[in-house]
Amino acid sequence: MSITRKIPLVLMLLSSLSFAQEVNGEKVFTDYCWGCHHQTSVAFGPSFQEIANKRTIGEIQGHIIAPKSTYKQLGHKRSVMPSFKDKLSQDELNAITKFIMSYKSKKDK
């Protein structure tokens, strides 16, 4: 096989590997969040819809990583949310944040 035929094949292979490694925010939700949060209604913790409508991406990520350091700044009296600093990769953190923000009301987008 000539080099001109190999290059497109290699590029296709690399792009498919990259696509396969994309982190799914809904999977992160089911793995870590669903026990306390629901997408649109209050469970033990606030709904993703409420969070998305009240918080910035930075506030959401900060609270996921260090809830004990951020809860007062966010107007809460206490937080029982565990830290996910050592549990989530940056890709997982970005994916769950994007998933949460997908519940933001259309009028607020």
Put a short name on every predicted segment.
Residues 14, 27-30, 75:
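Processing junctions and N-termini across compartments
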Residues 26, 38-66:
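Gly/Gly-Pro-rich "capping" loops immediately C-terminal to redox-active cysteine motifs
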Residues 15-20:
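N-terminal signal peptide c-region/cleavage motif recognized by signal peptidases
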Residues 1-8:
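Bacterial N-terminal signal peptides that target proteins for export
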Residues 21-39:
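Sequence/structural segment immediately N-terminal to covalent heme-attachment motifs in c-type
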Residues 9-13:
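Hydrophobic alpha-helical targeting segments used for export or membrane insertion
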Residues 44-52, 67-109:
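Axial heme c-ligation environment in periplasmic c-type cytochrome domains
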